[in-house]
Amino acid sequence: MKRFFFLVLIFQNAFSQEIPLNVQKIIKAYPDQIIGYKDNKIIFSDKTTLIYDDFKNKTDQELLDSPDIEDQFKFVYNKADKNLIPKDDPGRIRNEAFFKKIYGNSKSEVESKMTEIIWCPKLVNQKIKVTTVNGIDKIIKKLSAELDNNPEFKKYIIDIGGTFNWRKISGTNRLSMHSFGMTIDINIKNSNYWQWDCNCKNEDATLSYRNQIPLKLVSIFEKYGFIWGGNWKHYDTMHFEFRPELLL
């Protein structure tokens, strides 16, 4: 029996060593859609695959416009910290094909997986549409219930800026994460966005970081698998996006 468990341990260690750490995080974060990894390819539950690493050196703009899946982990996401002045954009690099495989390849396919829930029933009582993929609707209900116990956050979470909206990111040809129903923009009146503050769309513009969102509020979102756009050099402090793989 001891020999059996020893062999199992060896197999598990070999498996872990064969699969890159960040791929292991992806598999753990999206178990219903991703079933494995082989020959530098992510294997999805429908047996289709996507290249994990294209081994190309990319400029900052190329990382945004044509990243592979591995590039999504280029910058480490650090949880909310009062001393944080972001110098990178962790989570802002996204492989569009990957998220289409997870949530839907078109507006109609994404919409077929949507449901309506009540956002913060006690403090806000606002109807919003979110995806049911990976139980995100249930996760947001739990997030919502916790926020409801913090009335000091009401002004930030009322009249939220949006959830589902199949569209391109302003000034780009890249699909917004709002297209997948797994992103929440909270109240824009108490938020900052780099394009508004610099009155530009130039990624190379010199920016002065601004934020009004309490970090305790951010920490609650992070607890439920959401990263914060205020953690980016190109800050978007209203923006919360379900990316549990970056928090593992």
Predicted regions: what is each one?
Residues 14-16:
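Boundary at the C-terminal end of the N-terminal hydrophobic targeting segment
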Residues 4-12:
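Sec-dependent N-terminal signal peptides
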